Amino acid sequence: MGKRPIIIGVAGGTGSGKTTVAKEIFYQFNEKSIVLIEQDAYYKDQSQLSLEERLQTNYDHPLAFDNDLLIEHLHSLLNGQAIEKPVYDYKLHTRSNEVILVEPKDVIILEGILLLEDERLRELMDIKLFVDTDADIRIIRRMVRDIRERGRTLESVIEQYTKVVRPMHMQFIEPTKRYADVIIPEGGQNRVAIDLMVTKIRAIIEEKAVL
């Protein structure tokens, strides 16, 4: 890896399909040349709080994320240095004691709801994507995910969506759509958009290789 890595930001509301889009792009490249980093891994450490206090945290607000650490890690990767990516425990609502060693790669894919909200992160991205999906579809996907994967009850998911997730989406996430270079409708179902992005990324890689 001789040239500066390419950073692709994939943002969008919860349940929009942004994770699917990010993974579909990821799978089109050799694993030795690409890495996927989730913004969720950079939720702030809340180990000093009780579980009851952690449950009151607004996880859809920009202040829930430790973007300072994420930016520090991105600069390290850009400079050819490995990082120790934190691992977030969704059931305990704080960071676990584990970390994942991430080596620098030619392509870095960032994925998260509020990636485009922080100007410092936007400035590091070569391509900014926003995955745009109907709100009804997003809430259904969130319900299924949180109940199956994160040990939540249906009642708690609905309450969180109406009181926190939807208001935060309208206030903080939806406005970041204007920063996107490309808006992808229908999330991971949009094969045309995903294939176009892969082609564009390959072109950027080839362009950097001859500079």
UniProtKB/Swiss-Prot annotation:
<dbReference type="GO" id="GO:0005524">
    <property type="term" value="F:ATP binding"/>
</dbReference>
<dbReference type="InterPro" id="IPR026008">
    <property type="entry name" value="Uridine_kinase"/>
</dbReference>
<dbReference type="GO" id="GO:0016887">
    <property type="term" value="F:ATP hydrolysis activity"/>
</dbReference>
<dbReference type="InterPro" id="IPR027417">
    <property type="entry name" value="P-loop_NTPase"/>
</dbReference>
<dbReference type="InterPro" id="IPR003593">
    <property type="entry name" value="AAA+_ATPase"/>
</dbReference>
<dbReference type="GO" id="GO:0043771">
    <property type="term" value="F:cytidine kinase activity"/>
</dbReference>
<dbReference type="GO" id="GO:0044211">
    <property type="term" value="P:CTP salvage"/>
</dbReference>
<dbReference type="GO" id="GO:0044206">
    <property type="term" value="P:UMP salvage"/>
</dbReference>
<keyword id="KW-0963">Cytoplasm</keyword>
<keyword id="KW-0808">Transferase</keyword>
<dbReference type="Pfam" id="PF00485">
    <property type="entry name" value="PRK"/>
</dbReference>
<comment type="pathway">
    <text>Pyrimidine metabolism; CTP biosynthesis via salvage pathway; CTP from cytidine: step 1/3.</text>
</comment>
<keyword id="KW-0418">Kinase</keyword>
<protein>
    <recommendedName>
        <fullName>Uridine kinase</fullName>
        <ecNumber>2.7.1.48</ecNumber>
    </recommendedName>
</protein>
<comment type="pathway">
    <text>Pyrimidine metabolism; UMP biosynthesis via salvage pathway; UMP from uridine: step 1/1.</text>
</comment>
<feature type="binding site">
    <location>
        <begin position="12"/>
        <end position="19"/>
    </location>
    <ligand>
        <name>ATP</name>
    </ligand>
</feature>
<dbReference type="InterPro" id="IPR000764">
    <property type="entry name" value="Uridine_kinase-like"/>
</dbReference>
<keyword id="KW-0547">Nucleotide-binding</keyword>
<dbReference type="GO" id="GO:0005737">
    <property type="term" value="C:cytoplasm"/>
</dbReference>
<keyword id="KW-0067">ATP-binding</keyword>
<comment type="similarity">
    <text>Belongs to the uridine kinase family.</text>
</comment>
<dbReference type="InterPro" id="IPR006083">
    <property type="entry name" value="PRK/URK"/>
</dbReference>
<dbReference type="GO" id="GO:0004849">
    <property type="term" value="F:uridine kinase activity"/>
</dbReference>
